């Protein structure tokens, strides 16, 4: 069964990733609050680690991935640019499977954020296969990422200016989201070189579980909500 064919809906797959995203917006990203972007244009870097996953019989657990995006204006206006980076540890079959999922070609159109974002892009850079060094604590709202020669990023919680303690803020999306149902929020700083050159500092960061399958977003209570109790 060939990868990369959106029409081949017989593929059965699961993508459950602990993901860190840093974009250039302030801490009220328009994507999540149905608002215009902070600066009138959008740039974003997603980096994740597969805690569960497969594409048909191909296992994906333990692999890392990244997706970099740039738009000259609002995302909805299109003309975006995308580059995918896949963990160099993946074998040929895993690389093909991950690229198919992250490109948005493995699901029903517009049923997850990979597909939605792909629909707004007109330029697609060559996929890279590189080491992705990712350390992320979703509950702690911290991350450190390095993709040699391409990306450096770090993130942490926003600090409460009144008492100097981490400011705990989170976002629930009970319906209407094509990306997550719950995310922890913080601030990140990212520098990207190469085809997707961009940089932003102390800007929106979110930490979430991306849980998708061939039908779209899987609506399951995230482990990040454990502090809410039963």
Give residue ranges: language-model regions.
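Low-complexity, flexible helical/coil segments
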Residues: 57-64, 119-124, 179-186
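Extended, charged low-complexity segments
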Residues: 159-230
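Aromatic- and glycine-enriched beta-alpha-beta binding-site module
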Residues: 40-111
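N-terminal ordered "arm"
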Residues: 10-55
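Short, Lys/Arg-enriched N-terminal segments with co-localized hydrophobic residues
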Residues: 1-8
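Generic recognition of cysteine residues
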Residues: 23, 29-31, 42, 107, ...
């Amino acid at each position: 069964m060939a990868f990369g064919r959106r029409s081949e809906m017989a593929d059965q797959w699961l993508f459950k990733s602990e993901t860190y995203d840093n974009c250039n917006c302030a801490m009220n990203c328009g994507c999540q609050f149905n608002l215009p972007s902070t600066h009138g244009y959008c740039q974003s870097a997603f980096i994740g680690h597969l805690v569960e996953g497969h594409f048909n019989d191909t296992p994906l657990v333990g692999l890392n991935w990244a997706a970099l995006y740039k738009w000259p204006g609002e995302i909805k206006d299109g003309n975006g640019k995308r580059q995918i980076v896949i963990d160099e540890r993946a074998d040929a079959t895993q690389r093909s499977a991950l690229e198919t999922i992250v490109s948005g070609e493995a699901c029903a159109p517009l049923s997850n954020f990979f597909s939605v974002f792909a629909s707004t892009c007109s330029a697609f850079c060559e996929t890279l296969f590189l080491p992705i060094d990712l350390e992320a604590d979703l509950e702690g709202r911290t991350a450190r990422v390095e993709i040699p020669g391409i990306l450096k990023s770090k993130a942490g919680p926003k600090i409460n200016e009144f008492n100097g303690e981490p400011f705990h803020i989170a976002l629930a999306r009970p319906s209407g989201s094509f990306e997550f149902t719950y995310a922890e929020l913080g601030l990140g700083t990212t520098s990207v070189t190469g085809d997707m050159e961009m940089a932003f500092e102390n800007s929106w960061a979110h930490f979430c579980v991306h849980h998708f399958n061939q039908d779209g977003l899987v609506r399951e209570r995230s482990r990040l909500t454990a502090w809410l109790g039963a």
